[in-house]
C-alpha cells in the first residue's frame, strides 16, 4: 500500500510538469513553545493540494487518498460544496488521476 504522502509528492511533481501551479495545504493544530495553540486556519475537510491551472488560471482542489483511503465526512462536505462553484475539485489516488481531474475539469 502506498503512503498518501508519497502519492501527494508524485502528484505535485506531475502537475508542475504539466504547467500547473500546486500547493500543499498543511492543516491542524500545533502547540507552540510558549504553550499557545497555533491553528492553520483552514476549514475542516480542506483538500491536501490546491492550486490553479497554468493554461487559464482556473482553481483546483485535490484530496489525496491511497488505494483504500476513504473520505471523512468533512471532506465529503467540502467536495459537495465545491460542486456549485466554477472551481475543479476531486479525489486522486495517483498522479495520472490528478492530472486528469485538473485538465479535464
Where are these regions (language model features)?
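Catalytic phosphate/metal-binding cores of nucleic-acid and nucleotide-processing enzymes, i.e., regions
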Residues: 1-105
Amino acid at each position: 500500500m502506498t503512503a498518501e504522502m508519497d502519492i501527494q509528492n508524485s502528484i505535485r511533481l506531475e502537475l508542475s510538469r504539466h504547467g500547473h501551479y500546486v500547493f500543499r495545504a498543511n492543516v491542524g493544530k500545533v502547540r507552540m513553545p510558549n504553550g499557545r495553540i497555533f491553528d492553520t486556519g483552514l476549514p475542516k475537510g480542506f483538500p491536501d493540494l490546491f492550486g490553479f491551472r497554468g493554461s487559464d488560471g482556473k482553481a483546483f482542489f485535490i484530496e489525496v487518498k491511497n488505494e483504500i483511503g476513504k473520505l471523512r465526512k468533512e471532506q465529503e462536505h467540502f467536495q459537495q460544496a465545491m460542486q456549485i462553484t466554477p472551481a475543479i475539485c476531486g479525489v486522486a489516488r495517483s498522479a495520472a488521476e490528478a492530472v486528469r481531474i485538473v485538465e479535464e475539469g
